């Protein structure tokens, strides 16, 4: 949960360099707009205002000593390009430990109905 909070705080505060440090070179994000690489995710960060967020139902499964998946629900107050994107979303992040550092390889985000 600490990693998810740290990477989300970097996104919220538009800290592109710090945000990128949490992403593997082959990082992909999947959301309603499609599949994005790290550069596209950072471009989205620049046009997003995330004023508040909270996590719920966080579960982390250790798939191997170097792979873990975090699944959770996140509720946001946010806009993207001036459009209200607030709501509740289901999310998952696949993390890979490289050396002493965990990096996000894949992140998915789907708005709850």
Give the predicted meaning of each segment.
Residues 23-25, 56, 91:
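Residues that flank catalytic or metal-binding motifs in active/ligand-binding sites
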Residues 88-113:
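Short beta-strand edge/turn micro-motifs at domain boundaries
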Residues 13-30, 39:
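Short, well-ordered alpha-helical segments enriched in acidic and aromatic residues
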Residues 23, 74-76, 108-111:
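Short beta-strand segments enriched in hydrophobic/aromatic residues
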Residues 44-85:
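Surface-exposed, charged secondary-structure patches
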